[in-house]
Amino acid sequence: MQQTRTEAVAGAFSRCLGFCGMRLGLLLLARHWCIAGVFPQKFDGDSAYVGMSDGNPELLSTSQTYNGQSENNEDYEIPPITPPNLPEPSLLHLGDHEASYHSLCHGLTPNGLLPAYSYQAMDLPAIMVSNMLAQDSHLLSGQLPTIQEMVHSEVAAYDSGRPGPLLGRPAMLASHMSALSQSQLISQMGIRSSIAHSSPSPPGSKSATPSPSSSTQEEESEVHFKISGEKRPSADPGKKAKNPKKKKKKDPNEPQKPVSAYALFFRDTQAAIKGQNPSATFGDVSKIVASMWDSLGEEQKQSSPDQGETKSTQANPPAKMLPPKQPMYAMPGLASFLTPSDLQAFRSGASPASLARTLGSKSLLPGLSASPPPPPSFPLSPTLHQQLSLPPHAQGALLSPPVSMSPAPQPPVLPTPMALQVQLAMSPSPPGPQDFPHISEFPSSSGSCSPGPSNPTSSGDWDSSYPSGECGISTCSLLPRDKSLYLT
């Protein structure tokens, strides 16, 4: 039983070996038949391809045309297929010149890099030839100037316009082809010449398909730039430089857009509230301003836009008539105009109740009676201010001309109720002996103005601009309205 099993296994193994051997033999035979029989390694001098027509006569030659099986298909004749490096059948009479062209490849052998036989006889693709040139291109770096001179001289001699047919001069054709071969070598090494390179096909022949060497020159130049790390010059560097856009300058004489009455009222009032209470939030300030705006009458609300337009025209006087926002000279503070005794009497002379009595006869806002009054940071109308708080002799002295407390040449444009509200919002600092409030809360914006004695000690030039020397406000940092300051 065991012997029978062993014989069966041996028989199966032998059959397997025989089958595998038969297949291997068939493969070897087919390979030998393919190499030696159908595709013989025969290189034809007139063809750049293996002579397939010799081993298999059934294949069509390159000069034959294929006619359809039916006689009705005469319109569908396929044109002859021309290899890249072969001329068309109509140009086969130039074969002698082709032979001279094939011999040109022998001429240029720098440093023994190129073989002594032509590219056509080797049947090497143009890519392989260009790779061979690229690998050994560093050996040609020393001869680049010489090659360039040869190219320029040969092409100049070729383009000189000599009489006679081009194909009838083998020497001229040879020199032109050698120049083109040299220029092709230069282009393989990444050097761009100003000469337009043509494909190394005969000048008189026309190829149905583009030459592989002309199509691979650009690819090899790209590879050279990648390997050598050189940067390809940009096509047009002038396009990259973009002119920066110039910002349009704002015309100072351009009229401003009209501002709403509530915006002007909110701007002036919230500045005064923030000056007194820096820790107040924006919401609290907005509520206070809204309550003050609601308490105003319709006529007062409508008069605010007209005043806003007047103020916008004041903000844009001619350039030579602009008064300075800040005094161009340093003014001493309040303490320099008052003696220590006068200053002490001014600080402790009266109680804050005098301010309440002064404003009690006016229609005051109920929402601001209990809030802490902040100092105003915007100009007030001096006439209204003096009529509210100054004695009669001081009012008569200041009514002509009125002192402008704003940088604009015209008087301030705040309405009467707004001036009253600011009086309520002022700090309860004790007024002076003449029962008018302290107005030094805004010395930086409109100058230092201080109450002084009946005979103040100040500059005579300043006192001459007022009609009386007994003015309550003896010195101010700004000039009267009729003496506007001109900028130089």
Curated annotation (Swiss-Prot):
Coiled coil: none
Purpose of the protein: Putative transcriptional activator involved in the hypothalamo-pituitary-gonadal system.
Start and end residues of each stretch annotated as Required for transcriptional activation: 76-114
Keyword Mitochondrion on entry: no
Annotated DNA-binding residue span(s): 255-323
Compositional bias per record (Polar residues), positions renumbered to this chain: 302-316
Low complexity: compositionally biased ranges: 204-216, 443-460
GO biological process: positive regulation of transcription by RNA polymerase II; regulation of transcription by RNA polymerase II
UniProt motif (Nuclear localization signal) ranges: 223-252
Region annotation (Disordered) ranges: 192-258, 293-328, 363-473
Record protein name field: TOX high mobility group box family member 2
Example of a GO MF term: transcription coactivator activity
Top-level taxonomy: Eukaryota, Metazoa, Chordata, Craniata, Vertebrata
Localization: Nucleus
One Pfam family, short name: HMG_box
Cellular component annotations (GO), alphabetically ordered: nucleoplasm; nucleus
Composition-biased stretches (Basic and acidic residues): 222-239
Origin: domain of life: Eukaryota
UniProt keyword terms in alphabetical order: DNA-binding, Nucleus, Transcription, Transcription regulation
Gene3D superfamilies linked: High mobility group box domain
Compositional bias (Basic residues): 240-250
Keyword DNA-binding part of the UniProt annotation: yes
Species whose genome carries this gene: Homo sapiens (Human)
